[in-house]
């Protein structure tokens, strides 16, 4: 699950956000990148916590925190980002997205923009 969420963030930030930014969708993307940073840091904490031999109460807390973050984040994506993407993405961007979904891999060591120092 952690890797799938990271891959989802990569896909959005590298393939979806650039054409949306070029179309003038700046403020919503700023919010999305900031939220991606929070999600990324929660994923890192969760992965570190789960690397032990037992599941600690902090892991359960992090899972709950992640679920809440995702609920808020996804509602914005569904209402704002994805409808705009349907309107402004050129066919070439759609083709890149589909190709990545089919077999693309996130580059080793990639970190989302909102979690970079």
Language-model regions, residue ranges each:
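Small-residue-biased structural context
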Residues: 1-117
